A protein has these predicted regions:
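Active-site segments that bind and position negatively charged phosphate/pyrophosphate groups
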Residues: 1-68
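C-terminal charged capping/lid subdomain of soluble metabolic enzymes
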Residues: 61-122
């Protein structure tokens, strides 16, 4: 158990200081607020990342289609304003990866309204 806890801690440190970009914060929001498993949340998030990673998003979607991976769509279509607020807060809290990907002024890019639009595209 002790080794597993140390490994988990080190993994968290690695993610927190890496260039995981915009995907992980949005995925974490889906996991925290909507209880979607992390791996699936990453896949769902990639469906709305074209504006940040056009080539990678296109390649990901092409590969998912080729492999017949069924990625749920519309998971954020009928949420309440409170849920969108929770998603925003659960996403924007990941300051390090967002700053790494978008710069120190990432909050000017990922406003609550912009974040809602991105989630609605999922």
């Amino acid at each position: 158990r002790q080794k597993l806890m140390v490994a988990s801690y080190l993994g968290g440190c690695a993610i927190g200081n890496s260039f995981v970009g915009v995907v992980h914060p949005f995925s974490a929001g889906l996991s925290v607020v909507l209880k979607i498993h992390h791996c699936l949340a990453n896949c769902i998030t990639m469906t709305a990342m074209g504006q940040f990673y056009p080539q990678a998003a296109e390649e990901f979607l092409r590969m998912a289609k080729k492999q017949k991976v069924n990625i749920p769509r519309g998971v954020c279509g009928n949420l309440t304003q409170d849920q969108y607020g929770q998603l925003y807060r659960a996403t924007i809290i990941h300051e390090k990866p967002l700053a790494n990907a978008l710069g120190k002024e990432f909050r000017n890019i990922l406003t609550a309204e912009k974040t809602k639009e991105i989630f609605q595209a999922m």
